[in-house]
Amino acid sequence: MPLPHRSQQELWVCHLGTLRYLDALAIQEHVRALRQADELPDTLLMLEHPPVYTRGRRSGAQDLPLGEDFYRAKGVDVIATDRGGQLTYHGPGQLVGYPIMRIEDVHRYLRTMEDAIIAALAQQGPRARSRRDEGIDYTGVWVGERKIASIGVHVSRGVTTHGFAVNVENDLEPFSGVIACGLPDVSMTSLAKELSDERLQEQASTGAPALHTAPAPACEPLLACFRKRMAHSFAQAHDLRQRLVSPQRLGIDTTNASRRAERAPLNTSPPAPAEAVPV
């Protein structure tokens, strides 16, 4: 069934909570098939993952110097994927976004994704930047020389899967001891770390005494706040209206333990006004 014109101008945003990586991959493939058939509009899946290392198409054995079994013994799975890029880490407290979108120019899409992340971070405080001119290994978003967001995508029949991961308040230690993003000396950072560092610098410059309890960030809780800003920024970057939808509207069954996508009938009727995301 063709999409109504109204839906063609929307970005559907779906919050999936915390999902195992392979279950999220199955959901992406399910939603991608629907998007390729024009049974739903461009869609942004937002979620977190339990600890996992994922390999992109350019990742090699050198990225995990101690071997995959060592990392699995520490409780971190290792999964090969069809996305671009090299090795990265996902874990609790990191915001992962999987846009399932019809695109024409993948390079423009990557640049727009970087710009959307930069804009969302700017609303929270850190001045982030792209290093796109320094080569493919520098794809992503940086605060100074520190990487705060990774990007890797796959395009099939004009529709994207995979996407971005922004370090919000996740543990950065798992990035140590691996070669993340193909950059042996890369320094990773997070939104929480940058906000904390900014407060310390402000205290040092004003001579104010350091407090055991730092002032609360502008919006709490941090991850939920940034997720809202990221969805708004991403929709705005693509000139689309964002609309919150449930997993069931996408034909996703999240009631079973595995959280796998099911081929349930898609509800293509316009979302009720109550589901509109305030922006």
Predicted regions and their residues:
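Generic non-transmembrane alpha-helical segments
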Residues: 116-124, 225, 229-240
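A hydrophobic, small-residue-rich beta->alpha segment in the mid-to-C-terminal subdomain
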Residues: 173-235
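Beta-strand scaffold of nucleotide-dependent catalytic cores
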Residues: 150-152
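Conserved phosphate/anionic-ligand binding catalytic regions in large, soluble enzymes, centered on
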Residues: 157-172
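Residues immediately flanking
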Residues: 48-50, 155, 168
